[in-house]
Amino acid sequence: GHGFYYASGSITDGWKWYDNPETINKLTPLFEKYGVDMVFSGHDHQLELLQKSGVSYVICGTFGGALDSEREYVSPQSVWYSSKDYAFVDVTINGAEANLIFRDPDGKVLNSFVIPKN
């Protein structure tokens, strides 16, 4: 989806750009119930990997507009975060695991993770 679920972030113009209770309360129980392994979103202009109850949440919103400022709030679900680079996420699924590689526009690796299937 476009909008985020769990996320680190800041308050901008009165809006909380982090851990969205509306999407968390409505959709994350379904992700957990039906065994969803990974959820991708953007909207926030940052890179982040978050994990909660066996579901990995990947935010990759850094290939367009201005990058977000450094986060003021750190989500308890956050595993890794960056708002310093324009980037994309390269995903390879190999049977029981997914390899996530966050890359800058030139392909340089910023970070990588192996996510096992639930």
Predicted regions and their residues:
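Long, structured stretches of catalytic cores involved in phosphate-ester chemistry, encompassing
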Residues: 1-110, 118
